[in-house]
């Protein structure tokens, strides 16, 4: 005959979601409005409590009915799509400048609205004369030019190290299906534009 072993069932642990349904509803609403307003193919948002790390909302503009085969087969774009983090990278770079002692937040730089290096021109998102900004002012104004100037002595290896310390190019640990770790190339492959815009 066949031998079988029977193992008694045990109660599982409680699972508590950190999603706030009101925040989730509002985020979905804003995403649909933004998608329509800007003619975007889709939109995503993640709202996180910065103190606890809890995810309060994780949404994309796609309409998929929960529990359906489509929902099971389609991971959320909020975790599966790779995208450029944009000006969030300025905060990461700035933390590296400060930790390495390259700058203090009170250091001042004369920042024009554009700069050209090796035939490539980089601009701020708004026109302005040459401004005397502290590093805090550069961050406040989200100045691309100011960040390039402040990062002139910031080694690529250190830049890469800080990006990885902040989780760029790595999975989040949410363990959601289809999660992408993103893309972060080795600094040995960076060209000037990558270095200045990463």
Q: Can you say where each PLM-predicted feature lies in the sequence?
A:
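Extracytoplasmic/periplasmic proteins that interact with beta-lactams or build/remodel peptidoglycan
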Residues: 1-44, 64-67
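Beta-lactam-recognizing serine transpeptidase/beta-lactamase-like catalytic domain environment
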Residues: 2-6, 19, 45, 49-85, ...
């Amino acid at each position: 005959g066949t031998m079988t072993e029977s193992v008694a069932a045990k109660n599982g642990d409680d699972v508590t979601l950190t999603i706030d349904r009101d925040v989730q509803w509002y985020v979905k609403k804003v995403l649909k409005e933004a998608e329509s307003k800007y003619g975007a193919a889709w939109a995503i948002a993640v709202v996180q409590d910065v103190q606890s790390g809890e995810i309060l909302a994780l949404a994309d503009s796609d309409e998929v009915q929960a529990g359906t085969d489509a929902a099971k087969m389609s991971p959320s774009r909020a975790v599966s799509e790779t995208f450029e983090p944009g000006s969030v990278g300025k905060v990461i770079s700035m933390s590296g400048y400060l930790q390495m002692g390259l700058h203090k937040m009170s250091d001042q730089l004369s920042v024009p609205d554009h700069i050209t290096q090796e035939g490539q021109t980089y601009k701020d998102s708004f026109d302005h004369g040459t401004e005397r900004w502290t590093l805090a002012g550069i961050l406040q104004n989200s100045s691309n030019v100011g960040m390039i100037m402040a990062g002139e002595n910031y080694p690529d290896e250190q830049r890469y190290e800080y990006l990885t310390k902040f989780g760029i190019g790595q999975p989040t640990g949410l363990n959601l299906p289809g999660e992408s770790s993103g893309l972060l190339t080795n600094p040995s492959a960076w060209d000037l534009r990558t270095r200045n815009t990463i």
